[in-house]
Amino acid sequence: MGYIGAHGVQTLHRYKYSGVDHSYVAKYVLQPFWSRCVNFFPLWMPDVSCTEVSLFTSLRYHAVAFSLFPELTDNFIGVHVMYMCPRPNMITLTGFLFLVTSALLGYIYSPMLDSPPPRWVNFAHGLLLFLYQTFDAVDGKQARRTNSSSPLGELFDHGCDALACAFEALAFGSTAMCGRDTFWFWVISAVPFYFATWESYFTNTLVLPVVNGPTEGLMLIYLSHFFTSLMGAEWWGQQFGKSMPLVSWVPFLNEIPTNRAVLLLMVAFAVIPTVYCNVNNVHKVVKASNASMPRALAMIYPFVVLLGGVLLWDYLSPSDLMKNYPHFVVVGTGLAFGFLVGRLILAHLCDEPKGLKTNMCMSLLCLPFAIANALTARLNDGVPMVDEFWVLLAYTAYSVSLYLHFATSVIHEITSALGIYCFRITRKEA
């Protein structure tokens, strides 16, 4: 059974992306930079097919004819370049792989994310995140440059962004020695992301405010990486009042570790206001259309259960999962989150009825078993029925399998419906 029905296929053909970025930093600083960067990406990609080889051979032997008839050159090169042009999804995927590399560096040099890695690793985290942001912005420009925008591009782009929340949380956890709090840094990136996706489903436009995560948020993070490469990761472990003397007068905050203080400040001044605006905007749309707000809120249910289930599992766990296995917890939950976001985006692209999508709950399938296994430890002198490492490994493997099945299936269905390829700009033969 596929993910896209007949109505969805029809909708894909007429879907148009709508998004607005009100960030002044993006408008006056980064957009000009990104516009220059896109010119570094070629409009061509070598292929090894016989047709390509013959075209290059023809191009070489007909150089004289092209010089005599320049209009022939324009037509030939125009058609040929479009045939070999790499689809922007390749740029998106490359940017995402930068963050996977960053997370792997963190795992190698700080396996439990509670010890300082070499300072060059902090610098590498910052550089790789900067490259991710650049590639993530340039892919859309490349799509417009090559006239290859498609619903698949939006799903691919935002799908990679959803997974990026997990891998960058691990990279930042390495830099700031967050330890078990690394999961919470993933949460404060995942919550606004999910609510923004949910909002765009109802408003049909992705609106980024004057200060937003993809621009100022990422900039703040990679600047933090660069700062740590100079100051050392120990800066994040000392009391906030010592790290920031100007706020040493603030009670409570000045006595807790800097990384935890930053976490609380982000929740108070970034996450809560953003989510409030998202819910308020959806409420306006629902009210104007005389729809049901509880039905709209039901689409948040799987995400809330995912977070609640993982937190309950960790609370009951005798193994302290988030401390001993932070990478497995974040990657497993991050991929389950990626499935939820991808399913929500697909519902938007295909104009599905608003409300809970039951197959979104597939991402929650392992949690009841994991929680039950943790409970058995309370009946067996602290020893669970199954070693929690293997349960966590199974949870992560299931999340990986679920996401890969969803991603490959949907890519196949969309490319078949639209007659395109995922990583190459050329029409499929009928």
Range-by-range predicted roles:
Residues M1-W44, V48-S49, F56-C85, S189-A430:
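C-terminal membrane-associated helical module and adjoining short loops/tails
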Residues P46, R87, I91, D136, ...:
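Structural signal for hydrophobic/aromatic residues that build the beta-strand cores
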Residues S54-L55, N75, V79, T92-E154, ...:
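Membrane-embedded alpha-helical segments that form the functional core of polytopic membrane enzymes
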Residues I108-Y109, S174, L349:
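Helix-loop junctions at the membrane-solvent interface of multi-pass transporters
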Residues Q142-G217, I221-Y222:
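Histidine/cysteine- and/or acidic
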